[in-house]
Amino acid sequence: MIKFNSTNKTYWLPIYIMNDTSFQSGMYLYLLLTEILLYVGTGVIICKTVRTFLKIRLFHRNMNIMTALFLCQWFEAIAAKLLIIPYQIGVIRFSDYNKPYVSWWTDNEQEIIVLPEPTANSNALVISGFLIWHYAYTMIFGILNLGIERIFATVMLKDYENKPRLYIPVFLITSTHLITLTFSYFVLTNRTGFYLGTSPCFLNSALVVMTFLAVWKVNKHRHEKLEGSGPGCDYTLSQQFQVRENYRALKLAKNLVIVVLCAISVPCALLICLVIGAIPSFRMIFIHIMENFIYLNPVIICSTLMFSAPAWRAEYLKLIPGYKKIKSTRVFVVRPKPQTTHRASSTVVHDEGQMYFEQLNNSWK
């Protein structure tokens, strides 16, 4: 945390270590280089993931738009992180003091970095901190948007697919950013305090779980009604498609929700433990774990998303160098199936989403 005497304002920066020159030598340099390479790899994985689910369209455009923006928000955080690194390792100094600062949040005036007035370096640090807070809270609230979009799809079952309804993602994305920008500013300027600042993490996680379970129950009942052979199923073609899409989307979202909630809750829990001093002996280890959960979590999220659908998985695995060659030279397959059946099932699985959309579009011509 830093404070400016000229304005008497205190800023809570999402940075634990500042001005530590020990990171400029030895093992820490290799660790820093490794982290930067991991960030580059994470960016490649995000781009590949977004390209894959936009190329192989398995779900409604509104859901694709919101998922793409949700994942691409990571680039905001990593740009801020790369700007902060020189301050963390002491290459750029924002004061004349040479000692390192180790703190996250505190109400002890002696542990706060006090500066006479804002400078260009300190302003850059504050802006970077704001971007990281914005990314963190957008991630917390963004996962809820995917559930709300499925609520719209569930309620508007009659004609959701044949009308674009771009106002839904626009409204959800705009309202989310208005909330997160405002809340990020309050957290940055330390107006919320520590516990109020971290409370959305757990409150929103509970809300996401309740929303998911409610939508899942409704759509599971509709899917069972559609697939059953008994009377009472009078869905139109578009409604049948929407029921199937909702059910497939929620099956995909189940693992994704679990992974995202873990990616949100674990750093928040570690942050609370660090602030209250519950883990002083392993502080540095948990700092790196917490930061990696924040900046590297798209690797787990994207992999979970891509492995949820066979068509996406096949495209995603092409990112592995030599994957095509390994696949073509494989000599045996565990529990092989007849070739004709395998081909037929693979084609159906690969084109299932595309086939639904084509049939739906043809029915409305």
Swiss-Prot record:
One of its GO terms (cellular component) is membrane. The chain crosses the membrane at residues 26-46, 65-85, 124-144, 168-188, 196-216, 256-276, 285-305. It is found in: Membrane. Pfam families: Sre (PF03125). GO terms for biological process: sensory perception of chemical stimulus. PANTHER family: SERPENTINE RECEPTOR, CLASS E (EPSILON) (PTHR47757:SF1), SERPENTINE RECEPTOR, CLASS E (EPSILON)-RELATED (PTHR47757). This is Serpentine receptor class epsilon-38. It comes from Caenorhabditis elegans. The gene is sre-38.
